[in-house]
């Protein structure tokens, strides 16, 4: 189930979006004048088949109608167009990696928060990738932030020796809409077309799941050895993903991207 909208919390006088046992207890008291212990509230929530979970964050600016329109109208029309043109559809995204990033959880003695020692040299690298539902995966690593010029260079790498026309789904990052990008896309004479996802809806992009997998199973699980370069590690990990079409296809089975078809 989707989390209640912020207005629901605020209508009860709460200015945040986390249902804790204490908040539920207070709400029960407000509505029914019944005072329960924290333990009793926890038992009640468990009986309702509710569990404590780390929520996904979703921007307030998200437009549900635009999301639904993308899923029900825009994307199906894109699929039909690609079939007529004998073209391929890929989803594109960028992400950053850091050697000192901590993902996931670790076991430790109760009551003593573990400390992860970070390397003195904080290596960082960025990566871009494109993924399609049939299991194909393209990627590149780079340094620094994304500019229009760099995006064009990456697109040229993606298009190199590509025989079929390509429809590329991207987000609304300013670099993706730069004039130099528009000029390059126009120069391909229909070989490359960009399509923009609704704003504040990264969950519609299966490439986000690639990054989640890469970060969860990469340096976070196997820290860099002394002298090892992060960029080389990230490159090898992304290459392993590219070599595993079955894994790539699995990203498209996530409920958030179930609207995507071949």
State each model region's role.
Residues 37-48:
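Major-groove recognition helix of helix-turn-helix-like DNA-binding domains
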Residues 92, 155, 164-177, 200, ...:
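Acidic/histidine-rich, metal-coordinating catalytic segments
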Residues 85-89, 207-262:
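C-terminal anion-handling pockets and recognition modules
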Residues 9-38, 83-85:
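A short, amphipathic alpha-helix used for macromolecular contacts
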Residues 69-156, 259-262:
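Extended, low-complexity cationic-aromatic segments
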Residues 56, 113-121, 186-206, 222-223:
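RNase H-like polynucleotidyl transferase catalytic core
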Residues 1-8:
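Short, small-residue-biased leader/transition segments that mark boundaries at the very start
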Residues 52-68:
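Short Lys/Arg-enriched helix C-cap and helix-to-coil transition segments
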């Amino acid at each position: 189930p989707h989390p209640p909208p912020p207005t629901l919390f605020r209508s009860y006088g709460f200015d945040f979006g986390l249902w804790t046992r204490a908040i539920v207890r207070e709400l029960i008291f407000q509505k029914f004048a019944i005072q329960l212990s924290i333990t009793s509230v926890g038992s009640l929530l468990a009986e309702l088949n509710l569990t404590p979970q780390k929520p996904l964050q979703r921007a307030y600016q998200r437009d549900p109608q635009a999301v639904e329109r993308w899923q029900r109208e825009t994307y199906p029309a894109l699929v039909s167009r690609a079939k007529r043109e004998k073209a391929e559809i890929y989803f594109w995204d960028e992400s950053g990696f850091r050697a000192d990033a901590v993902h996931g959880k670790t076991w430790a003695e109760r009551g003593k928060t573990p400390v992860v020692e970070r390397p003195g040299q904080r290596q960082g690298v960025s990566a871009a990738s494109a993924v399609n539902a049939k299991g194909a995966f393209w990627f590149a690593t780079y340094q620094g932030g994304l500019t229009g010029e760099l995006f064009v260079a990456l697109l040229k790498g993606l298009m190199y020796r590509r025989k079929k026309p390509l429809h590329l789904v991207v987000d609304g990052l300013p670099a993706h809409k730069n004039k130099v990008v528009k000029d390059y896309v126009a120069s391909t004479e229909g070989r490359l077309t960009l399509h923009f996802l609704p704003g504040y809806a990264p969950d519609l992009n299966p490439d986000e799941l690639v990054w989640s997998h890469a970060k969860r199973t990469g340096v976070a699980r196997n820290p860099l050895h002394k002298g090892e370069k992060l960029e080389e590690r990230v490159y090898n990990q992304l290459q392993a993903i590219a070599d595993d079409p079955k894994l790539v296809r699995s990203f498209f089975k996530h409920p958030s991207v179930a609207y995507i078809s071949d």
